[in-house]
Amino acid sequence: MRPYDFCGKENNESATKLKQGLVGKITGYGQSMTPILKSGQSVICEPVKDETKLEKKDIVLCKVKGHYYLHLIWAIRNDKEYLIGNNHGHPNGWVSRNQIYGKVVEKL
């Protein structure tokens, strides 16, 4: 299946499309994930479903404290809470699984 092109979309729209079950291409901007992801680099995200395995160091599209991030899972607590942060040592905060919309499965 060809991925839905989320590029240029607001992250809340991308999150909605992922919740609808669409695989999507997302472009991230900024320096917070370098060198793992460069500013302007696109990734393929798959929707996070009940059976999706989430692990430390996975890159996910999530919502933390009202903001959307394409950041790393730093830690997992009780198999249901996830500490999200960037690649430069800055944590964003803890989220529940339902605040994680997509998991990066390929860097383009």
Can you annotate each of these PLM segments?
Residues 1-108:
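Extended hydrophobic leader/signal-anchor segments used for secretion and membrane insertion
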